[in-house]
């Protein structure tokens, strides 16, 4: 946030048009829940804060780019949620780039795998969350990003007395066939449910 505000202040006094625009370009990498949320918040800022607090920017505009390597946003959610998020962000003026990957960020330029470059001084990386690796939990117990496969009770696949919650786990359900999004609210809900289940397990032992 501080970096973004500093860049906006720089843009108001910058006399080089190319540098001025680079200061106003924001690139968000990762079209998951966090990337969509951040892009939405930035678009609100673009619409309601900039005209009021930074009138000196004149004809220059903040450009928000959301880059996702797969074919859709919110890959862990339903097709309807993905489509709605894309339409909402596009209506808010976000430039969505799908099926492209960032291969480098050098000298203030973002380089994509198709050769496209985007000059920016603000790069927000919210892609590629990888779970912490645990010894002896390997192979068929893991899925993409080394997330641990669990059932609806957060039990690790095939292990009745080991549980996993939050970013580290992968639980497939009809509404989330690719696992739940790796956000705080999911971890909180799983933690509360697991606490209740562990209490029930202990009660049954007595």
Q: What is the meaning of each model-derived region?
A:
Residues 1-17, 109, 117-196:
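FAD-site-proximal beta/loop scaffold in flavoenzymes
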Residues 1-34, 41-48:
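Glycine-rich dinucleotide-binding loop and its adjacent helix/turn
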Residues 16-22, 53-61, 206:
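Short helix-terminating capping/connector loops at secondary-structure junctions
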Residues 31, 69, 167:
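Cofactor-binding loop segments of dinucleotide-utilizing enzymes, especially the Rossmann-like FAD-
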Residues 36, 67, 165-166:
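Active-site flanking residues adjacent to catalytic metal/cofactor-binding acidic residues
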Residues 43-152, 156-158:
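A Rossmann-like FAD-binding core segment of flavoenzymes
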Residues 44-47, 185-206:
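Internal hydrophobic alpha-helix adjacent to the cofactor/substrate pocket in enzyme cavities
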């Amino acid at each position: 946030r501080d970096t973004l505000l500093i860049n906006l202040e720089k843009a108001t006094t910058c006399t080089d048009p190319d540098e001025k625009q680079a200061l106003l370009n924001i690139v968000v990498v990762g079209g998951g829940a966090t990337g969509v949320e951040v892009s939405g918040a930035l678009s609100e800022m673009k619409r309601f804060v900039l005209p009021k607090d930074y009138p000196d920017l004149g004809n220059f505009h903040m450009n928000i780019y959301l880059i996702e390597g797969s074919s859709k946003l919110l890959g862990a959610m339903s097709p309807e949620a993905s489509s709605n998020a894309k339409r909402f962000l596009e209506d808010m003026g976000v430039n969505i780039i799908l099926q492209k990957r960032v291969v480098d960020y050098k000298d203030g330029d973002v380089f994509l795998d198709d050769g496209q470059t985007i000059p920016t001084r603000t790069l927000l990386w919210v892609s590629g969350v990888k779970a912490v690796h645990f010894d002896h939990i390997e192979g068929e117990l893991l899925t993409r990003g080394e997330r641990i496969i669990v059932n609806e009770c957060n039990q690790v696949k095939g292990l009745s007395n080991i549980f996993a919650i939050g970013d580290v786990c992968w639980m497939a359900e009809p509404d989330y066939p690719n696992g739940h999004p790796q956000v705080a609210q999911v971890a909180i809900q799983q933690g509360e449910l697991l606490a209740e289940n562990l209490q029930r397990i202990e009660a049954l032992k007595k």
